[in-house]
């Protein structure tokens, strides 16, 4: 049996998330609550920890307070064993400036790599919803001899124009990496599907350091991992693709195997929540063999009183549904739905309250939103448009702490 390689995890968590506004008005995108009990960053951290990659640096930047607090409170590992998950804010090692891109974030954090001296570096994004065993991708990277490996998910060619697309040969070597092409390349075994980059990369350490340092000296670079570093390594013949459909996650069902969602817009964020609520969900939160770890707050169980009910819904701990109806919705912790209220097809974040006789439909309510008695959200879009953000798909989004 070969010795396990020394792997360092780097999570890119500096995303501002403008397209998720107002959910990102007061927090970084990876800190946005998701699924009733989690934040977006919990998915990548769970995947790394489940694979026993237990030395992880989370590079943060914009509005990172709630993200830093979440990591420190809910992701404490054993320091005695040399294990850690640590948030690393912009260090300004090169002067008083923020990170100029994801590659620059790593460049300004090279000291972390030198201190750890890993064999390989796992560089993953922080704002996607999925399960993955990264150890399988690391094994393929080592066996292939590539300097960089990019996780690719298969999508129909007609849907690939909005993503970074991978053109690879039959051996998995990447011939070209193209951002949002008008004519996406097919995969070697299926011309009607395209490998789309998931924003997850494995690097041999020296290859990453050399590429990052060369990129830092390039005045014409945007200093982006997907836009600059990967194309540079593709041109050097050093990059390979990992087919995400080959990833076997313990406990996965046929229905949710290969599930991955970019939730960078309000509509995508909403749709990913609707994937959770059916009897046989598209994405199963209840896989005990590959758990998603989230908030560790000690809360009372959810309670349904006075005939209150929830159908095809996820309801978080501490919530109370009193003589109200909840359908096809995801409610986070400590949500109260009062007598006679109706919540349908909605996402309700922690601490929100829906008052007596109120109606909430096709909406996202951020933390601590209060919908007053008899008020309506998502019923009259023209009226809502004057008060709230509305997505292209007609989802009403109400920002944190708003009273209606």
Curated annotation (Swiss-Prot):
InterPro entries found in the cross-reference section: ADP-Glc_PPase, ADP_Glu_pyroP_CS, GlgC_bac, GlmU/GlgC-like_hexapep, NTP_transferase_dom, Nucleotide-diphossugar_trans, Trimer_LpxA-like_sf
Family as reported in the entry's similarity comment: Belongs to the bacterial/plant glucose-1-phosphate adenylyltransferase family.
One annotated GO biological process: glycogen biosynthetic process
GO terms, molecular function: ATP binding; glucose-1-phosphate adenylyltransferase activity
Name under which the protein is recorded: Glucose-1-phosphate adenylyltransferase
Enzyme class: transferase
Enzyme Commission (EC) number: 2.7.7.27
Pathway field: Capsule biogenesis; capsule polysaccharide biosynthesis; Glycan biosynthesis; glycogen biosynthesis
HAMAP family: GlgC
Pfam families: Hexapep_GlmU, NTP_transferase
SUPFAM superfamilies named among the record's database cross-references: Nucleotide-diphospho-sugar transferases, Trimeric LpxA-like enzymes
Function description: Involved in the biosynthesis of ADP-glucose, a building block, required in the biosynthesis of maltose-1-phosphate (M1P) and in the elongation reactions to produce linear alpha-1,4-glucans. Catalyzes the reaction between ATP and alpha-D-glucose 1-phosphate (G1P) to produce pyrophosphate and ADP-Glc.
Signal peptide limits: none
Residues annotated for alpha-D-glucose 1-phosphate binding in this entry: 99, 164, 179-180, 197
Catalytic activity: alpha-D-glucose 1-phosphate + ATP + H(+) = ADP-alpha-D-glucose + diphosphate
Keywords carried by this UniProt record: ATP-binding, Carbohydrate metabolism, Glycogen biosynthesis, Glycogen metabolism, Nucleotide-binding, Nucleotidyltransferase, Transferase
Domain of life: Bacteria
């Amino acid at each position: 049996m070969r010795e396990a390689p020394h792997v360092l995890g780097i999570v890119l968590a500096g995303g501002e998330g403008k397209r998720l506004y107002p959910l990102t008005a007061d927090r970084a995108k990876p800190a946005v609550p998701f699924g009733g009990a989690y934040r977006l960053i919990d998915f990548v951290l769970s995947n790394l920890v489940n694979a026993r990659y237990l030395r992880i640096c989370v590079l943060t930047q914009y509005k990172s307070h709630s993200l830093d607090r979440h990591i420190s409170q809910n992701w404490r590992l054993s320091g005695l064993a040399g294990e850690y998950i640590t948030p690393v804010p912009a260090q300004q090692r090169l002067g008083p400036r923020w990170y100029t891109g994801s590659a620059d974030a790593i460049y300004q954090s090279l000291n972390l790599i030198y201190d750890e001296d890993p064999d390989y570096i796992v560089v993953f994004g922080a704002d996607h919803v999925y399960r993955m065993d990264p150890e399988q991708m690391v094994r393929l990277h080592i066996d292939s001899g590539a300097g960089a490996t990019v996780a690719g998910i298969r999508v129909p060619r007609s849907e690939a124009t909005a993503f970074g697309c991978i053109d690879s040969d039959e051996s998995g070597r990447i011939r070209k990496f193209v951002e949002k092409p008008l004519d996406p390349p097919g995969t070697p075994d299926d011309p009607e599907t395209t490998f789309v980059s998931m924003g997850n990369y494995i690097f041999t350490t020296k290859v990453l350091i050399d590429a990052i340092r060369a990129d830092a000296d390039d005045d014409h670079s945007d200093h982006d991992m997907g836009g600059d570093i990967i194309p540079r390594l593709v041109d050097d013949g050093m990059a390979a693709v990992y087919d995400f459909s080959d990833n076997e996650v313990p406990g996965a069902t046929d229905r949710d195997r290969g599930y991955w969602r970019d939730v960078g817009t309000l509509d995508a964020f909403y749709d990913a929540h609707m994937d959770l609520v059916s009897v046989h969900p598209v994405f199963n939160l209840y896989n005990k063999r590959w758990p998603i770890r989230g908030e560790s707050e000690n809360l009372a169980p959810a309670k349904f009183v006075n005939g209150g009910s929830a159908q095809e819904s996820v309801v978080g701990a501490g919530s109370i549904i009193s003589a109200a109806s909840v359908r096809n919705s995801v409610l986070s912790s400590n949500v109260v739905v009062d007598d006679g209220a109706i919540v349908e097809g909605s996402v309700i974040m922690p601490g929100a309250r829906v008052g007596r006789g109120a109606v909430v439909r096709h909406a996202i309510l951020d933390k601590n939103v209060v919908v007053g008695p008899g008020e309506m959200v998502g019923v009259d879009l023209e009226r809502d448009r004057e008060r709230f953000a509305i997505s292209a798909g007609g989802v009403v989004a109400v920002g944190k702490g708003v009273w209606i």
